[in-house]
């Protein structure tokens, strides 16, 4: 009860800021789009539209970014040819640069997760060493809860590798991170040092980035892993200013949970227009925001004809659904049983599959909404394959490229890279594996 009350209080507080900032944001930004106008002013604690001016010209959904196709080096990974979709998106939203490397602020990261594109943006700011120290000065005093990125605002640096790492936290279950964490924990105390964390970050980030690239588009080579020459937000958050602290898995798990909660609360506020509840139409808009399937018009027809006006979804229901979306691979395996048996997926079967995949249940309110939206034939059955595609696009913010890689193959790659990382750690420590 206390936790729920706290969440409601946070939503109410941010909702108040959002509503007070709407007038300011609408005056400052010319034609920002219905969702950008709703949040750009106050939901990000003073993210005024003066922050937006021209720099990058971006096509909305076709991926034609004006990022030059060239050789790119980012903390040890060399990209040859056209950058990946995630790299393009990172360049679109990043606002800081130091010695040829681009960085996001915490506010940039939140915008990149919430919005499809940045319509107007200031010029990239070139940082000196003194600027970097000033930018990172607020991290030590910032709270470590579910408002961490909002509280920091522009006071922080996020590298491309860290950007990929944070996105993976939003789209994958915690279990895989725990496995990779333990693989790099050579002492068995569930604590890792800074250099080991870099390897964990590289392992996860590399796999996620490769999954957003079509094999005939981009060539990748991996250079020797090297530590960044400057501190970043995550480094100082986990290891302190001098990098001498150790990171315990429990602390890292709390960070993952808080990050997921923060993004969920931000997106809830964005699509509920700052209210403490989300209309079912708003939920459908959130669900279909990054979708370009040929059946999108049918989905919206279902929303208009099948969802009753005045019905809403609570923040807790929304969070439960977001938790479910981090287990899509496991859920897809459960759905394959119905495909192989040529059986339609009805509400009871869907509810059971969710419980098996996540260990939790979705409310009947959410399930009823999902079924009404994705019932293409009017037979009260779910078109689950396209439903999964819509959800994957939603969670990957429109950058998902369909793969033939299963979750087992994904974590097999992670395990392989983890073993390589372990060998390097032991080699540096002057120890043998056995």
Curated annotation (Swiss-Prot):
One of its GO terms (cellular component) is mitochondrial inner membrane. The keyword DNA-binding does not apply. Keywords: Disulfide bond, Membrane, Mitochondrion, Mitochondrion inner membrane, Phosphoprotein, Repeat, Transit peptide. PROSITE patterns: EF_HAND_2 (PS50222). Changing residue 172 to A: Does not affect interaction with MICU1. It is found in: Mitochondrion intermembrane space; Mitochondrion inner membrane. GO terms for molecular function: calcium channel regulator activity; calcium ion binding; calcium ion sensor activity; protein heterodimerization activity. Residues 1-22 form a transit peptide. Changing residue 206 to A: Does not affect interaction with MICU2. GO terms for biological process: calcium import into the mitochondrion; cellular response to calcium ion; mitochondrial calcium ion homeostasis; mitochondrial calcium ion transmembrane transport; negative regulation of mitochondrial calcium ion concentration; positive regulation of mitochondrial calcium ion concentration. Ca(2+) 1 binds at residues 185, 187, 189, 191, 193, 196. Its main location: mitochondrion. Changing residue 154 to R: Does not affect its ability to regulate the activity of MCU. The modification Phosphoserine is found at residue 205. Ca(2+) 2 binds at residues 375, 377, 379, 381, 386. Residues 172-207, 227-262, 293-328, 362-397 form the EF-hand domain. InterPro entries: EF-hand-dom_pair (IPR011992), EF_hand_dom (IPR002048), MICU1/2/3 (IPR039800). It comes from the Eukaryota. Changing residue 107 to E: Does not affect its ability to regulate the activity of MCU. Belongs to the MICU1 family. MICU2 subfamily. Heterodimer; disulfide-linked; heterodimerizes with MICU1. Component of the uniplex complex, composed of MCU, EMRE/SMDT1, MICU1 and MICU2 in a 4:4:1:1 stoichiometry. Calcium sensor of the mitochondrial calcium uniporter (MCU) channel, which senses calcium level via its EF-hand domains. MICU1 and MICU2 form a disulfide-linked heterodimer that stimulates and inhibits MCU activity, depending on the concentration of calcium. At low calcium levels, MICU1 occludes the pore of the MCU channel, preventing mitochondrial calcium uptake. EF-hand domains 1 and 4 have high affinity for calcium and act as sensors of mitochondrial matrix calcium levels. EF-hand domains 2 and 3 are degenerate. This is Calcium uptake protein 2, mitochondrial. The lineage of its organism: Eukaryota, Metazoa, Chordata, Craniata, Vertebrata.
């Amino acid at each position: 009860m206390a936790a729920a009350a706290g969440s409601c209080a946070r939503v109410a507080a941010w909702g108040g800021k959002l509503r007070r900032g709407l007038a300011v944001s609408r005056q400052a930004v010319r034609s920002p789009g219905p969702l950008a106008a709703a949040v750009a002013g106050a939901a990000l604690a003073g993210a005024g539209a003066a922050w937006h001016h021209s720099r990058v010209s971006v096509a909305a959904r076709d991926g034609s970014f004006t990022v030059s196709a060239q050789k790119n080096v980012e903390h040890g990974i060399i990209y040859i040819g056209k950058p990946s979709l995630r790299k393009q998106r990172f360049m679109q939203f990043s606002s800081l640069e130091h010695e040829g490397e681009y960085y996001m602020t915490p506010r940039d990261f939140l915008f990149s997760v919430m919005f499809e594109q940045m319509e107007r943006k200031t010029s990239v700011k070139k940082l000196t060493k003194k600027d970097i120290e000033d930018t990172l000065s607020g991290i030590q005093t910032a709270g470590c809860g579910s408002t961490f990125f909002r509280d920091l605002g522009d006071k922080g640096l996020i590298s491309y590798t860290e950007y990929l790492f944070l996105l993976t936290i939003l789209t994958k279950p915690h279990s895989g991170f725990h496995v990779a964490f333990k693989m790099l924990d050579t002492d068995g105390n569930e604590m890792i040092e800074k250099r080991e964390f870099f390897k964990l970050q590289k392992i996860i980030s590399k796999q996620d980035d490769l999954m957003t690239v079509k094999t005939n588009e981009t060539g990748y080579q991996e250079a020797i892993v090297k530590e960044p020459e400057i501190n970043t937000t995550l480094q100082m958050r986990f290891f302190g200013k001098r990098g001498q602290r150790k990171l315990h898995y429990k602390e890292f798990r709390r960070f993952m949970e808080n990050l997921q909660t923060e993004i969920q609360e931000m997106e809830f506020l964005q699509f509920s227009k700052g209210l403490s509840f989300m209309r079912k139409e708003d939920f459908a808009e959130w669900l279909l925001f990054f979708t370009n399937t040929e059946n999108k018009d049918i989905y919206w027809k279902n929303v208009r004809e099948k969802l009753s006006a005045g019905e809403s979804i609570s923040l807790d229901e929304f969070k439960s659904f977001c938790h479910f979306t981090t287990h899509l691979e496991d859920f897809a395996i459960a759905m394959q049983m119905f495909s192989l048996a040529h059986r339609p997926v009805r509400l009871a079967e869907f509810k059971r599959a969710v419980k098996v995949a996540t260990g939790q249940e979705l409310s009947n309110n959410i399930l009823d909404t999902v079924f009404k939206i994705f019932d293409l034939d009017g037979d009260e059955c779910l078109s689950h394959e396209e439903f999964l595609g819509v959800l994957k696009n939603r969670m990957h913010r429109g950058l998902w490229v369909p793969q033939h890689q299963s979750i087992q193959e994904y974590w097999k790659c992670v395990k392989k890279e983890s073993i390589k990382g372990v060998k390097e750690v032991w080699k540096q420590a002057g120890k043998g594996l056995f």
